[in-house]
Amino acid sequence: LAVLGSVAMYLPTFGYFASAMFFLAGLGVLRTLWLPLLEISPTVLKLGCIAYLPFLLLELILEEHQIYSVVQLVATAITGLGLLVFTLGTATWLYGKFEKHEIVDFWIYKYSRHPQYLGFILWSYGLLIYVGYKDYIRGAFRVPPTLIWLITTMIAIGVALHEEIEMKKKYGKKYEEYCRKTPFMIPLPKPIVNTITAPLKLLLKEHPRSMKDIIVTTVLYTVILITLSYMLILALKL
């Protein structure tokens, strides 16, 4: 399943992002796996376009020639930040295992329980922004794979939730105490956290405690984000 997922989603997405002269750009040929989706509707890959909302709002206040330079700068910064967070997370985890810590809860793990997944999401988001605001040659396939990015991100979050369940089984209250002190991915104000988790609390009343709960959670938020994206497409005629 992991291999099939990589071939169908991760590798073609990376190929989409790669520059024309980049040695891995040939991975873009795997985008042909998405053609059945395009047969359903040419805009199906836009069903994750809610990810572009901050930049769509920028278009309302900036002129067209300003948009591209600002967005490219932001995309570069987010991509670089993602690589930094991922590298720090990996280095911290390896050091913790080398020192035989049961729970890695220091350095960057004091601020995020899953910095490696966070780094991947930020890195891929930066690249998603980049391909959405770049010049294409005439006739190029120019629909950013926002739906694929959304699904990939939700898979990463689902894996992180599964790891938390396993850690709680293994370390019990010790890991639960760490969870109370450290945010899941990003430190956010409590009102924002409550807003984000409101749909989950309505459905499950508590955090996911089984694989079934994880599937319900990831499907729920995926459906919500796809619905919001569809509403955005209709409203802005994307």
Sequence positions of predicted segments:
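Membrane-anchoring alpha-helices and their flanking helix-loop junctions
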Residues: L1-F106, L118-L238
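Alpha-helical architecture
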Residues: G80, Y111-S112
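Conserved SAM-binding loop
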Residues: S112-R113, L118
